[in-house]
């Protein structure tokens, strides 16, 4: 897990925004698409 922590964190945020779109209300400036630089 250690060496891939950044990858897993970005993926977790992406999944959170996909499953709970209302969460994006608090982060309107984020590009929540998969692989975006803001979620890495």
From Swiss-Prot:
Tissue-specificity statement: Red blood cells.
Organism taxonomic ancestry: Eukaryota, Metazoa, Chordata, Craniata, Vertebrata
Annotated disulfide bonds: none
Subunit structure: Heterotetramer of two alpha chains and two beta chains.
GO molecular function ontology, one term from the record: oxygen carrier activity
Record-given protein name: Hemoglobin subunit alpha-2
Residues annotated as domain Globin: 1-40
Domain of life per record: Eukaryota
Keywords carried by this UniProt record: Heme, Iron, Metal-binding, Oxygen transport, Transport
Function comment: Involved in oxygen transport from the lung to the various peripheral tissues.
InterPro entries assigned: Globin, Globin-like_sf, Globin/Proto
Residue intervals passing through the bilayer: none
Keyword Phosphoprotein among UniProt keywords: no
UniProt record similarity statement: Belongs to the globin family.
């Amino acid at each position: 897990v250690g060496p891939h922590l950044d990858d897993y964190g970005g993926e977790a945020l992406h999944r959170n925004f996909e499953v709970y779109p209302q969460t994006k209300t608090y982060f309107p400036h984020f590009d929540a698409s998969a692989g975006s630089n803001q979620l890495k």
